[in-house]
């Protein structure tokens, strides 16, 4: 456990969580979306002992360690979906030390909604990353008889290279996110036993048409699954530019979309 204390590196602004979250373990850090818990994890990955206002120089391949791990979940790599082309996202070009902290909280490399869907499905599937498909089956109807003429086969791309006890902790953390007081509370009806994770990232848009992408906004994401004890479906919602720092209006569209699509899914499929 550790307290949710801010981090200060030499010649860099102080970095904190969205509020002071008090004493944290890994479950509560996920539930409350702690930035600083991830910062200290990044220091461990970089084999660095943190102290206030320290110079930070990465002496190992910390970025590569993160990216290789994320790739096992489907982040930064192709999902294998049955489309002629797909993006692998956007990889940050500068691996300077301070950016590792941004990377650790999802504020550096960029991923597609499909990759987020595969990532959360991998967790729901207990570490099995499955190939994505838009098409499941094709049937023909002849003389009122139904005949299967094509079927996409279930294909496992890889298994997570981690001990099941650590994946279990992540799953417990995602359940906590959706519980009372968690950042995902209310996104999916609690009766469906959801697990998931909210995300908030800084983004920029051109608001006055001058060709400069210089207005800071916030984009929201959600990835989750239900029920957590026997997952039937995963849900991924990405809502860009939902909040503009120049206004007092804040949109909860990401939450509303998640509520509606999850509710409709379980109404139809049970």
Regions found by a protein language model. Give the residues of each.
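Beta-lactam-recognizing serine transpeptidase/beta-lactamase-like catalytic domain environment
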Residues: 1-239
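Short, gly/Ser/Thr-rich active-site loops of penicillin-recognizing serine hydrolases
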Residues: 145-149, 154, 252-270
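Membrane-interface anchoring segments and C-terminal beta-barrel signals
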Residues: 220-224, 231-233, 243-244, 257-268
């Amino acid at each position: 456990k550790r307290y949710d204390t801010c981090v200060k590196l030499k010649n860099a602004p102080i970095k904190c969580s969205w509020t002071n979250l008090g004493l944290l373990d890994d479950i509560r850090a996920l539930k409350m979306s702690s930035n600083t818990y991830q910062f200290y994890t990044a220091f461990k990955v970089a084999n660095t002992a943190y102290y206030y206002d320290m110079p930070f120089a990465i002496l190992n391949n910390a970025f590569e360690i993160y990216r290789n791990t994320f790739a096992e979940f489907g982040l930064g790599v192709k999902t294998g979906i049955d489309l002629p082309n797909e993006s692998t996202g956007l990889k940050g070009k500068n691996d300077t030390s301070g950016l590792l902290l941004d990377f650790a909280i999802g504020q550096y490399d960029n991923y597609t909604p499909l990759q987020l869907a595969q990532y959360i499905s991998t967790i729901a599937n207990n570490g099995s990353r499955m190939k994505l498909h838009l098409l499941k089956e094709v049937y023909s109807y002849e003389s009122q008889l139904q005949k299967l003429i094509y079927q996409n086969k279930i294909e496992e791309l890889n298994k997570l290279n981690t001990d099941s006890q650590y994946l279990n902790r992540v799953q417990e953390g995602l359940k906590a996110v959706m519980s009372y007081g968690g950042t995902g509370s209310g996104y999916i009806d609690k009766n469906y036993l959801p697990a998931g994770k909210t995300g908030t990232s800084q983004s920029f848009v051109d608001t006055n048409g001058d060709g400069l992408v210089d207005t800071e906004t916030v984009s929201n994401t959600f990835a989750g699954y239900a029920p957590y004890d026997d997952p039937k479906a995963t849900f991924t919602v990405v809502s860009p530019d939902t909040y503009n720092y120049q206004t007092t209006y804040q949109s909860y569209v990401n939450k509303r979309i998640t509520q509606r699509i999850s509710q409709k899914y379980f109404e139809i499929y049970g």
